[in-house]
Amino acid sequence: MSLFNVFRKEIEWGGRKLVLETGRIARQADGAVMASLGDTTVLCTAVGAKTKSKFDFFPLTVNYQEKTFAAGKIPGGFFKREGRPSEKETLVSRLIDRPIRPLFVHGYKNETQLVCTVLCHDLENNPDIVAIVGASAALTLSGLPFLGPIGAARVGLIDGAFVLNPTRDQMADSVLDLVVAGTREGVLMVESEAHELSEQQMLDAVMFGHEGYQPVIDAIIALAEQCAREPRAIEPPAPEAEAVAAKVREVGEAGLRDAYKEADKMVRHDKVDAVRDAVTAAFAGDDAALALAGAAFKDLEKDIVRGSILDTGLRIDGRDTKTVRPIEIYPGILPRAHGSALFTRGETQALVTTTLGTGQDEQIIDALEGEYRENFMLHYNFPPYSVGEAGRMGSPGRREIGHGKLAWRAIHPMMPAKDAFPYTVRVVSEITESNGSSSMATVCGTSLALMDAGVPLKNAVAGIAMGLIKEDERFAVLSDILGDEDHLGDMDFKVAGTANGITSLQMDIKITSITKEIMNVALNQAKDGRIHILGEMTKALGNARSDVSDFAPRITTIKVPPQKVREVIGSGGKVIREITEVTGTKIDIEDDGTIKIASADAEATQRAVDWIKGIVAEPEIGVVYTGKVVKIMDFGAFVNFLGTRDGLVHISELSQDRVKKVGDVVNVGDQVKVKCVGFDDRGKIKLSMKQVDQVTGADLSTQAPAEE
């Protein structure tokens, strides 16, 4: 008799086999599913604590991890084991979290953890989609109060046609990389990068993905019908909850309504805090009621703000639903930075800098798919002072990594090709003030800072964050949302792009799903806002600077025959090290013979260019060269010239006068001018000093004899 009671569901999905299996591995987890697409396999587990946590929020943790053995590799580094999460692992963890979090039953606060481990990667099917599907299945089987399942799919656009779950090779030809996840009824999450696609194309792609993942939802339901655990009993609301909510409304409603008429964020928050203190004081001595009052206070805030917007069409700061906050822009604000811009929109501000480097500055990324280099980096920082708080400063958190990647996706399609602009580019966005949509301020500031640095973007890029308030059939889509509107609303919908189309779309829904109609309204309203912001950006800086900063390295590219690369590098890198040390330049050499020389000093660059050209040049008969005596023999002197080449100046070619001893004319280390006069039968170079004026370098053999 087998130890395992295995249940398995297998479907054909997008031309490949999707397999969901449970009962064999991780049987002590509440839910465990081995999900496979092709030969890419991810183990997804879900565990929920049996008791309610002490937190007033839902403590859900999602950990996505890639094991190097999945691709037949051993980790690098001294310890030879996996360490802290990579950027991709962090991003995929967020990708799984976002569509799952809103589907847990309201009020469920038990600590819950999802772990998705990549066990096998066929280097064809991306494991992120497999992980989302597996996580959804594990939760559906677990008995936890999860209102799923959800499905997920990747959508590509190749030769004008949408492709469901394109392979890695197919993605190289796609102008769209879109991940969509949601329920049978609607979409919960979108993450994408696009090459200036229209609003209609993006909407069609989302709906194509929504339709594409329906078979996955059916498969998970079919599996759950066979083996799902009994649903956990949910703790009912406390009997006194209604009475507490009524008292919170009685004490706090008037003060909150007054507070949310205040346009200034800091003043508004002070007023809200004062009302919260009054509510807390009203429950002094009743710890049980006080524990319920916090949630009731948040519900009251939501009712007031949301109701006001739906009833009046006016928002917290007095704007209507479509107006963008005032914008002020200062390009080139930091004189020594290679490029910079200060972008301020209302109470949200980003100080963005661009730094230009060489190929040696590229980021080397060791992924399961193999090592590759990235020459465009964008880093987003959110210090606590940006929201008027004192807090921990340290390495970037998941949110900072996610916001930076969103801005990177928005800008990346507009970056120039590497052969047209051979720099490594690093952008840093410091959020110095924040009241909503700081990631979109980063997009705008990045576009401006890149143009200020002389980076020839194909088109300027702007971004805008949209929000949603929905009650039954009534809804309002909000342009350029505030932080409070994001917190109290139902949707975070970020759109970035150019005047020609969308380059990035990110959507997160806090309710069970939204309709195609709402997405269509949001996309078109976002376009109007984006065009307005681009107009403001154009007023400040219409085009990229014609040249890079005086403080940035100048990169000169030359081409040498591939077979000459070894000569330029030299034995053990000796030659190239000498060139860089003597000239003070940075030099990158590629196998195809492309050499990039970088320096802020034009003269240093030219010296390095001349040096390299000298190394790869072939000696020509009749041409005069400058060289150095490297060895003396009885029959002549060996002179090094053209980098690594040596030639012999025979004793008879040292001087017009008769020479008895070579050392009478030259010594080792002397700089001399020599003329190539031919090659011997073994191909060795024959040189002459007597045919060259050692002062001027003139070729004496071409001058007419003096008249007597």
Swiss-Prot record:
Required cofactor(s): Mg(2+)
The S1 motif domain, residue ranges: 622-690
The enzyme's E.C. designation: 2.7.7.8
GO MF terms held by the record: 3'-5'-RNA exonuclease activity; magnesium ion binding; polyribonucleotide nucleotidyltransferase activity; RNA binding
Organism: Rhodospirillum rubrum (strain ATCC 11170 / ATH 1.1.1 / DSM 467 / LMG 4362 / NCIMB 8255 / S1)
Record domain KH: where: 553-612
Cited Pfam families: KH_1, PNPase, RNase_PH, RNase_PH_C, S1
Residues bound to Mg(2+): D486, D492
Protein's recorded name: Polyribonucleotide nucleotidyltransferase
Entry keyword set: Cytoplasm, Magnesium, Metal-binding, Nucleotidyltransferase, RNA-binding, Transferase
HAMAP family in alphabetical order: PNPase
Function according to Swiss-Prot or TrEMBL: Involved in mRNA degradation. Catalyzes the phosphorolysis of single-stranded polyribonucleotides processively in the 3'- to 5'-direction.
Family: Belongs to the polyribonucleotide nucleotidyltransferase family.
PROSITE patterns: KH_TYPE_1, S1
GO biological process, one term: mRNA catabolic process
SUPFAM superfamilies: Eukaryotic type KH-domain (KH-domain type I), Nucleic acid-binding proteins, Polynucleotide phosphorylase/guanosine pentaphosphate synthase (PNPase/GPSI), domain 3, Ribonuclease PH domain 2-like, Ribosomal protein S5 domain 2-like
Top-level class of the enzyme under EC nomenclature: transferase
Reaction equation(s) it catalyzes: RNA(n+1) + phosphate = RNA(n) + a ribonucleoside 5'-diphosphate
One GO term describing the cellular component: cytosol
InterPro entries: ExoRNase_PH_dom1, ExoRNase_PH_dom2, ExoRNase_PH_dom2_sf, KH_dom, KH_dom_type_1, KH_dom_type_1_sf, NA-bd_OB-fold, PNPase
Subcellular location: Cytoplasm
SMART domains from the UniProt entry: KH, S1
